[in-house]
C-alpha cells in the first residue's frame, strides 16, 4: 500500500501534481491527492475523468497503524480508514439513509395489512373479510353491509341494475324477480316429433337463471352494469339432425357421433376379394419365349430325362432334323 509521507510533520499534505499547494481532494482512481486547481485540470479532460470519485480531504492526521495517513473529513468525524484504500467518504451517511429508507419500504410491503388499508382507504374487503362474505350466505352482518352498499350505489347511479341477470330466449316474457332468492332454472323439454326440416323448428329451449343470490358472494356490488340479456343462437341444421337422430335411435346416434374406426378393415376385405377373383382367372400355361431353344432341346439325346453327350452321327442326325424342322416350321426370328 502506498503511503503519504508529509514533508513537514503536522502540516497538510502537499498536492501530488504541483507539489506546492495543499491537497484538497483525494482521487481513488488516480491514487493521488490533488489541490483544487490540479483537480479541476485533471478531471475536466474527458467525461471518463469527470466520473472519478474524489474525497474532500480535511486535516491529515498522524500515520495510523498501517503506516498510511488518515483523512479527517471537514465535519470533524475522524475516520479510521487509510486514504489509499478510499473506503471513507462523506457520502456514507447518505448511502446509509437511503439503505434505511429501502429497508423500511420493503418491510411495509412484506407486512402489508389488507384489512387496515381497506378500512382506511374505503376499498372493498380483502383477505379474511372476503372469506367472511363468502361464508355468510344466510344473512347477518354481511347481508346488512351488502344491502347498505347496494343502496348507496343505487342512489348514486340510479335504477341501472339490482344485481340480477336474466338469461332467456327472445320472444318469451321474463319474470320479474325481486329480493334474494335461490337460483332457479326452467328447462322446457325438447319434443323431437315436432321437428321440421330446415333451420326452423317448433320446439323451444328456455333457460331462466337468476343470479340475485350470488350477490352476497360478490365483494363489490355491481351498480353501474345494465341488465344483461343473453340470447341463445339458433342451432345449425347439422346440430339439429344430430340431436334428432340421437332422440330417434341410440344406435344411429352412436354411429354418427363415433369416428369411422372400421375403414381399415373394410379396405382390407375389398383387397382380399379382388385377389381371389384374380386368382380364379389365372392360367398356368408355360410361355415359350425362345422357339429355337425349344426345338434344339427336343432333338437332343436324353438319358433318364437328362441331356447326354452327342457323337458325330448324332450331330448329323440333329442337323438333318433341324433342317427339316426349319423347312417345315419356317425361320424363327431372334431378338
Swiss-Prot record:
A zinc finger (B box-type) spans 15-57. It is found in: Nucleus. GO terms for cellular component: nucleus. Residues 268-310 form the CCT domain. Residues 141-179 are annotated as: Disordered. GO terms for biological process: flower development; negative regulation of short-day photoperiodism, flowering; regulation of flower development; regulation of photoperiodism, flowering. Zn(2+) binds at residues 15, 18, 38, 43. SMART domains: BBOX. Induction: Circadian-regulation under long day (LD) conditions. Expression increases after the beginning of the dark period, peaks at dawn, stays high four hours and gradually decreases until sunset. Probable transcription factor involved in the regulation of flowering time under short day (SD) conditions. Functions as a repressor of flowering under SD conditions, independently of HD1, EHD1, MADS50 and MADS51. Controls flowering time under SD conditions by negatively regulating the expression of HD3A and FTL. Plants over-expressing CO3 display late flowering under short day (SD) conditions. Belongs to the CONSTANS family. This is Zinc finger protein CO3. It comes from Oryza sativa subsp. japonica (Rice). The gene is CO3.
